[in-house]
Amino acid sequence: MIKHLAEALRFLTILPIPGKPALSEQALVRSMVAFPLAGTLIGGLVAATWFGATWLWGTTTGSLCAILTWGAITSGLHLDGIADSADALFSWRSRERKLEIMKDSRIGTMGAIALISILLLKWLFVLGCGDLAWRALIVAPTLGRWVDIIGIFWFPPAAEGGLGRTFHDHTRRSDFWWATSCAGLVAAGLLWWWAGLIFAVVIVATIIIARWMVRSLGGLTGDTYGALCEIAEMLVLAVVAALVNHQVL
């Protein structure tokens, strides 16, 4: 598991992880079982930033610093995905044209709106989490990377070749359930029985959005995995903020 976790961190972050990178796509696929734990470590660094920046400058600036650190650690990997996905999905063009738009490195109007919206919502929801923000900041990236596995395992890839197809074809059912168990333990350990509600919201939203993406694109792509991850992270923060606002958490 340590080997898989190290490979997952190399793939998902810019952190300097000791050791040699994977020499094959299959080795990278095997690391997917550790994606949720990689998300937990990402969340730990983000939560530490929140603690430090909040102590120095208050919750507003602390929450903003946490969001910026979050994006920096991952090199905007999933943020790029939600921007590209928005440009393609809301172009209302043919399926082939949407896939072409998704490959374009330039960001369009809908992509910019989606990117700004997700960052702004995350920031506001972190503020709304109050003293429990650090817990939410750990759980959110954990479930976000778990949602990537849902997209890869349960939904078809849009392209016949590429890394997405390799991930889909070589992911085992046991990998999915192991990753699910890890994500569940982290969420339950930090948010107690409310983790069940958060899981339910994230799963339902992921299934609805992923099915829409499949109908629109013929399958999922690397960019749509990123979009699903970002949306899931935002939903975790949103649910925790709502529970705190109504004084039930």
Swiss-Prot record:
The protein's UniProt keywords, in alphabetical order, are: Cell membrane, Cobalamin biosynthesis, Magnesium, Membrane, Transferase, Transmembrane, Transmembrane helix
The record lists the membrane-crossing segments as 32-52, 53-73, 107-127, 136-156, 190-210, 224-244
Pathway given for this chain reads:
Cofactor biosynthesis; adenosylcobalamin biosynthesis; adenosylcobalamin from cob(II)yrinate a,c-diamide: step 7/7
Q: What class of enzyme is it?
A: transferase
Please indicate if the UniProt record lists Thylakoid as a keyword: no
What does the UniProt record say this protein does?
Joins adenosylcobinamide-GDP and alpha-ribazole to generate adenosylcobalamin (Ado-cobalamin). Also synthesizes adenosylcobalamin 5'-phosphate from adenosylcobinamide-GDP and alpha-ribazole 5'-phosphate.
Q: What is this protein called?
A: Adenosylcobinamide-GDP ribazoletransferase
From the broadest rank down, the organism's phylogenetic lineage runs: Bacteria, Bacillati, Chloroflexota, Chloroflexia, Herpetosiphonales
